[in-house]
C-alpha cells in the first residue's frame, strides 16, 4: 500500500472514531508500528491529527495549513463524485481551462476518460502530468513563475497568457465559498489566475466538494453575483441551496 493510501485510511478512520491506537492503525494498513509512527508524524506536521501517547486523535485542520499531498487525499471520493457531473457542460472539441487545486486533478482524469478532442489550458502542473500521460488533447501551458509547493504556475505573465485565449468552459476548483465573501482562496498567488480564466471563458463552472461551503479564506476572488454554476457532491449542505437559487446561481449535485 502506497503512503497516500495509508494516509487516507488513517484520516478516514480518525474522522469516524476520533482516536486510534498505534496497533489499530497498524492492523488497518497492514504495516509495522514503526511505519505507523512515521506516518503519524507526517500527518501531524500537515495538521491533520495530533499524536498522543500510544496513538493519535483527529484534528480538523484549516485547509490553509494542509500540504498539497494531504489536500489531494482529503474528500477524494466526493471530488471524484462531483466531477462526473461535468459531462453535462463540456462538449468534445471545446477549449477548456483547469486551474490549480486537487479537485482539478480529478476533473482532468474525468476529461481524459470521456473525451477525445479537447484543447485544455491549465496552470496546474499535476493536471499537465495527467494530460501528458494520456496523449489525447492539445494542452496549453501559460508562462510564469512556478510555485513548487502547489505545483502551479502564477504571476502577471501567466494571467496575460490566459487572456490571449477564448475559453469555452472554465472549470474552476475553489477552496472556500460563503455568501458573505463569495469565492475566497488561501493561495495568494492563485486568485488572479482564477479571475483571468473567468474573464476569458464563455461558461464558468465552479467545482467544490461539500467541505468548502461556509468557509472564508484570506484572498477575495469573486462575488456570488459573478457565479453561474456550482457543481458539488451528494454531501452538499442543502441549507445553502435556497440562497444560491435566489441569487441566480445553479447548484448541481448528484440525484
What are these regions (language model features)?
Residues 2-12, 19-25, 30, 78, ...:
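Conserved phosphate- and dinucleotide-binding cores of soluble alpha/beta proteins
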Residues 2-29, 34-100, 109-119, 132-137:
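HTH-adjacent hinge/linker in prokaryotic transcriptional regulators
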Residues 106:
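N-terminal active-site wall of soluble small-molecule enzyme domains
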Residues 55, 126-127:
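Short glycine-enriched loops at secondary-structure junctions
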Residues 103:
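Hydrophobic/small residue at the entry helix of a nucleotide-binding pocket
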